[in-house]
Curated annotation (Swiss-Prot):
Residue ranges of the motif 'HIGH' region: 15-25
Lineage: Bacteria, Pseudomonadati, Pseudomonadota, Gammaproteobacteria, Pasteurellales
Quaternary context: Homodimer.
Catalytic activity: tRNA(Met) + L-methionine + ATP = L-methionyl-tRNA(Met) + AMP + diphosphate
Record-level Gene Ontology MF annotations: ATP binding; metal ion binding; methionine-tRNA ligase activity; tRNA binding
Database matches in HAMAP family: Met_tRNA_synth_type1
Annotated localization: Cytoplasm
Protein name: Methionine--tRNA ligase
GO cellular component, one term: cytosol
Chain sites annotated for binding Zn(2+): 146, 149, 159, 162
Cofactor(s) it depends on: Zn(2+)
Organism this protein belongs to: Haemophilus influenzae (strain PittEE)
Ranges of residues in domain tRNA-binding: 580-682
Uppermost EC category: ligase
Amino acid sequence: MTTQPRKILVTCALPYANGAIHLGHMLEHIQADIWVRFQRMRGNKIHFVCADDAHGTPIMLNADKLGITPEELIAKAKADHMRDFAGFNISFDNYHSTHSEENKQLTAEIYNKLKANGFIKSKVISQLFDPEKNMFLPDRFVKGTCPKCKAEDQYGDNCEVCASTYSPMDLINPRSAVSGTTPIVKESEHFFFDLPAFEGMLKEWTRSGSLQSEIANKMQEWFESGLQQWDISRDTPYFGFEIPGVKDKFFYVWLDAPIGYMASFKNLCNREGIDFNEFWAEGSDAELYHFIGKDIVYFHSLFWPAMLEGSGYRKPTNVFAHGYVTVDGAKMSKSRGTFIQASTYLNHIDPECLRYYYAAKLNDRIEDLDFNLEDFVQRVNTDIVNKLVNLASRNAGFIAKRFEGKLADKLEDEALFAEFTAQAEQIAAYYESREYNKAIREIMALTDKANKYIDEKAPWVIAKEEGKEAELQAVCSMGIELFRVLMSYLKPVLPKLAERAETFLQAELRWDNIHQPLLGHTLAPFKALFSRLEKKQIDAVVEETKALFAAANKAAEKTEAKPTALSTVEPIAETITIDDFAKLDMRVAKVLKCEAVPESNKLLRFELDLGDHTRQVFSSIKAAYNKPEELEGRFVIMVANLAPRKMKFGVSEGMILSAGTGGSDLFLLSADSGVTAGMQVK
């Protein structure tokens, strides 16, 4: 009985059109591409789409800063993103943009259906308004004095000092973080999606067993804390789609972004005559999978299925979330040269190396993946060059020189061949469940067996003995056959190497012909299939990344605003004695690690080296240093004998010194070169 091909639609999360693609993005796109290529090899009907996420305030503000239109900015971003994905052999059937006619129409349609079904609510809310910029100010764009503890320079929703929450309008002396002006209060009608109405459906979907256990458990926590109505509107000025029938109101970017999956597929359907409803209509028997990062699970497991349910469309079959990429055990860092852009990598290294390395470490769980640069070189060279490609090269020479490229008419070891091909379904199961690490482990175990077979048969010895031509041809043909099976298994991971192998073998590598040996088949002349990865290539990537970071920093310094005539110098504090000053023990400290406190809008957490011990210090300088990882490796000045202070997020064991008026106007104090951690400031 013939099994009907599955109908599958796969998407990746939409990269934001306000920055370059980096190796963190590539984890997800490589993971999805391997799965898609595997499904194609299995004969399934699969479509793979993505798009740029092209709306929102950051794009509007960045375009204004660059002196171009948002449309020009997102057009360049899309071209850059498509180039990078193509460079890594990501086989999208379509790559689109959320700023498209298809997305505009689908967004309006879904909104109107939700509204007609009673799932859109409206209410008038009061917001602070910047009269100079003529824009409403979200919480993070307002600063002022905490109404509870009177701490200065606090954000508009919560105080980092006393942990109080409040409305932006409760702030004392509020100011716009955009222009610095004093905001006024204005009322505005906003539109809300009634997410709580879908709680029953979402709970049932969670219990279906199709979601990753980590996602299902997290959703249960969200249910327990209570679902809230979701504000889906933003006031002008805003770069996005206007809400139908409402003046100066726009859809929040997270409403139209996931609809971009549908829009990209719609664009493909219109171009190739595919039935859109066959994949998206309620009750569709097609499979729909979203590959995403763990940071956007909330939107994809709550808002998105609820929106689809409320507008009469089908829900995803599953949402596959993955973790983040770290480099050498730490967050990616521009200053250390490890925040690697895709284009920088492609300037120096074969993309198949990264595809293989990620595959060797990826599993079906939401775990961070460490990109260890030393291990990267060793694993690629050991597995691909020394084991896999060498298996072909060490046998191809004999077949070409002694037998005019023709393979033997029968298998030298049928049992060994059967052992290799018998693993096809197990390896397929690993690919299907996204346990690529297990698939690679199994394939490499077989590769070791193949090389052991050749080592034991020693064709280089047989070649020197008279009358053993048939044996030599049989052994080397067996080695080539095993290489063919292994390359078939690795084709989803290494598509370009597979293409070169197919040229050499003069045969297509398919899953359904793995069991069919190339008996009596003629090979093409052997050419080098893969180059060894050198450490100097890694060094070049790191140095180019550092140079890009330094150039960007230099450009930013040139464009920084000069202090205005209105700037004032704080008055000198009350006089103290030398004895008072002597009580302070100030030390030079080296930043080992610096990261944002997720629950805080203001704090950075530092891990500091003081020479003979380390300390944890929290500092309210997040607004001034929005890329904290770039501070790692710097020397700072700290007050070391300040009493430890227990805060909401942990114990702070000292104070880091900085200068400025507060907020984004803060500058860390540093020491001249030559200092070491722990030195006392005198």
